[in-house]
Each structure stands twice: as C-alpha cells, then as structure tokens.
Amino acid sequence: MASQDCHMLLSFFISTFLITVVTSQTRCRNFKSIISFGDSITDTGNLLGLSSPNDLPESAFPPYGETFFHHPSGRFSDGRLIIDFIAEFLGIPHVPPFYGSKNGNFEKGVNFAVGGATALECSVLEEKGTHCSQSNISLGNQLKSFKESLPYLCGSSSPDCRDMIENAFILIGEIGGNDYNFPLFDRKNIEEVKELVPLVITTISSAISELVDMGARTFLVPGNFPLGCSVAYLTLYETPNKEEYNPLTGCLTWLNDFSVYHNEQLQAELKRLRNLYPHVNIIYGDYYNTLLRLMQEPSKFGLMDRPLPACCGLGGPYNFTFSIKCGSKGVEYCSDPSKYVNWDGIHMTEAAYKWISEGVLTGPYAIPPFNWSCLDSKIKNNESLHTQYSLMNS
C-alpha cells in the first residue's frame, strides 16, 4: 500500500513538473508581430484613413502628434499610444493602420482599431435606444476585415496565416467604452447602460474564441478606464454635490463604480476562457487601476498636482467644452503635456499612456503577469523599464 502511495506521489510530482515546464514555455514568447483591434485608445491612423478630406477627425490637425511625431499622425493624443509603447518594448516597429494604407508593410503588425468603434454592432445599440453612427467600424467588422485580409497579410503560400497569428501579440481593446459613451453622453439612466455590459462582454469573448480557433496564443485584453475621471464626463455631469466626487482624485464615484462593474464582468469571462483554453495566454490589462494610480499620486510620476484638467481644450473648470474641441481653430494646448494626464478631455497624454503601458507590461497591473524571461537581453536590461517598474510597484 505504501509502495502504491509512493508511486502515485511520484507520478503526481512528475505530472506537476511537466505541466510547469509546458506552462513556462507557453507563457513566454518572442513575438514577431502585433495584431490589434479597438477604438481611439489604440487607433494609429485608421479613422483618418477612412475619412473623407472634407470630414477629417480632430486627430488630423495640430496639436495632435506634436510631442513625438511633431505632426498629426491620426493618433488621438499628443504623441504615442499604449500600443506604440508595447511595440517599442517588444522591439517591433510601430503598428501601422490597416484602413487607408496603400501598399502598407504589415510584416511586423497590423492595427484594425478605429476611433469611435464599438464592441456591439450599431443595430444592437439602436435596438437598445442608443444612437450609433452608421460609419462605425465595430469589433465584429474589424475582425471580418482581418480575416478577409489574411491572404494579403501572409501571401498565397499561407492563406490562413496560422504561423503569424500564433506568434503574434494580440491586443483586443480597450473596447466597449464607446458602447457606454453614446448612451451616457445622452444622459441615459446608468441602469439602462448596465444592460449593455453582458452584451459587450459576450462580444469580446466571441472575438477571442474566433482568434483562438485561428491559432492565436497570446492576448492582452484591457478593461475600461475609470470613466468618472474623464474630463468629458466631469464636465457633462458637473454637480455642486461634493458627495458624488472622490475626495482624493476628484473623480465621479458613480461612474467609476460602473467601470468597475464592467471590468469585473470582463475578468470573470476571461477566467472562464482561460479554463476553456489552457494552452492560451489570456491576460487582463488593468487600465483602470493604473490610471487611478496616476490620479492618486501624480507628483510621484512627474505629473502636476492637479491632474484632471485637459492639456488641450478651452473653457470650464476642466479646460474642456463639447462644442469647441482640441484641434479646432483657436484652441490652445499646454506648454508641457508631460505634466498632464488628460490630453483633450477624452484621451490621455503620451506621458500617461507610457505609465499605463509600463504598469501593465512590467508592473503589477496585468492578470496574470507577463513572463518576459525569454525576451532579448537588450529588452530585459532596459534601465528605464526597471525604473518605471519600481515606481509602479512602490
């Protein structure tokens, strides 16, 4: 009996060891490209490429892009986005936009994220009483474009692109923010908006499953930002009732509670998918708490002590007006965007995006954490990353 127990115990340890080895091998990958889906938080020029010359988005005009590119690049920020910092971290060129790119080089990545995009189809939102632009490129439409472009992306020799997809870092989102923005900007009741959350989560989950079936092995799926810290919402829902604001950050607590609700539902679904696909890395990016950390301790990260106002905007307590936005004639921007969290009232500055990317890639804001043990030594020995890491962890 004792011998049998020993045999079973030995088998258990061997099995555990093998599982650990397999897990460590699948957890750490040297990514060859980035494939991205999402909205304006990740758009590197798609909305600009899709727009007519007579109806260009604000990201087509200065001062967008001034900090890094020194000209508008189609990004909704003063400089680089989270996806750009991810690419730099992985030693991959900035990911080009798919839409509007003529003879684009997509060997190292392709980006389908479009400003204003929703997770849900417009027809679903319209059924729920929410207005949606018919030009919206939903997550489903982006995924459809990706699948239709596979022969072009990989060539006729590999029409399904399975090898490329398997070795790609796949970024899905943040997505879903606009599904909530549209009704919230119309001042819909928060309980009505909550009804959209299960639909949004299911849509994101379905996209992940489709990509897994196509060979995808590593996903970063970010949650929503704290909506209550958005300058647009702070302006729209401004109230003299101080109890509606967090005393430390000045953010609207009820809107942040909604963001937490979405993020909890998303994490629960990602946990289910991990159990369903144990061979796949599905990592949750905690954008919510990373951004909140910047709001709570701005000076620690080189930001100004009052981080809520927009760098680029006009009017009101938060330097933001819905009718006259950043990029419009006569709207000025701050002298030092690196001291600001908010760029234009809705999107963040390059400085904020850099901290968020570091918090997710090398800090405590990825669930489960990334394993970068097999990365190139130049990346692992990057001193600036270690500095950022220590700050985000302290």
Curated annotation (Swiss-Prot):
Q: Please state what class of enzyme this protein is.
A: hydrolase
This enzyme's EC code(s): 3.1.1.-
Q: Where is the signal peptide?
A: 1-24
Q: Which UniProt keywords apply?
A: Glycoprotein, Hydrolase, Lipid degradation, Lipid metabolism, Secreted, Signal
Q: Which residues are glycosylated?
A: N136, N319, N371, N382
Localization per record: Secreted
Tree of life domain: Eukaryota
Q: Which Gene3D superfamilies match?
A: SGNH hydrolase
Xref: PANTHER family: OS05G0506800 PROTEIN, ZINC FINGER FYVE DOMAIN CONTAINING PROTEIN
Q: What is this protein called?
A: GDSL esterase/lipase At2g27360
